[in-house]
Amino acid sequence: LAEGHSPKLLVRSESIYKVPSVGDCELIIGDVNDKGAVKKTIEGVDAVIYTIGIIREFKSKDITYENLHFGGAVNAIDAAAESGVNRFILMSANGVCPDGTGYQKTKWMSEQYLKNTDSKWTIFRPSTIFGDPRGNGRPEFCSQLKKDLINLPLPAPLFHEGLVPFNAGNFSMSPVHIID
């Protein structure tokens, strides 16, 4: 915004109240699995930034890794190509691989799909995103996790393998602050 850009944001109707009023942003109400809403959001932009990531699924509501990490990314990548948008930035995740968890696999699949396009693409893989996104003193998940676990007298950094002191330092951390 400070550079004069006018972002368009695709926002689910049930999440509209979570979006702060930020001047020149155009809000499009819709779902990433609705190709029409995705296309409407992407028309007329210079670049697409895809940052969807869920940490748990709600299959009864079709909120799945497959639908959002991969299917939604494919819809956005395809809509960008159809609209002539040649710049695509994809937020993936640290530790993605084809044979990992559902989270890791679907993030990996979206990376592979994007890599096989003619777009000028950037993929970034944060391990955690931290900060106070709404400025209301309520930090999001990773900041709360830091407060509850890392600031303890005994740090607990090995979430994926439990507390195994011999494995300390054998994992990658790429934290990203919300301002970045």
Report residues per predicted region.
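Conserved cofactor-binding/catalytic machinery of classical short-chain dehydrogenase/reductase
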Residues: 34, 72-75, 87, 110, ...
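Cofactor-binding loop segments of dinucleotide-utilizing enzymes, especially the Rossmann-like FAD-
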Residues: 12, 93, 131
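NAD(P)H-binding glycine-rich loop region in Rossmannoid oxidoreductase-like domains
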Residues: 16-83, 94-99
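Oxidoreductase cofactor-interface core, primarily capturing Rossmann-like NAD(P)-dependent enzymes
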Residues: 3-5, 99-180
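Short alpha-helix in the Rossmann-fold core of NAD(P)-dependent oxidoreductases
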Residues: 66-73, 89, 107, 174
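A short helix->loop->beta-strand "cap" motif at the edges of active sites that frequently abuts
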Residues: 82-87, 118-119
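Conserved glycine-rich Rossmann-like NAD(P)H-binding loop of the short-chain dehydrogenase/reductase
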Residues: 5-13
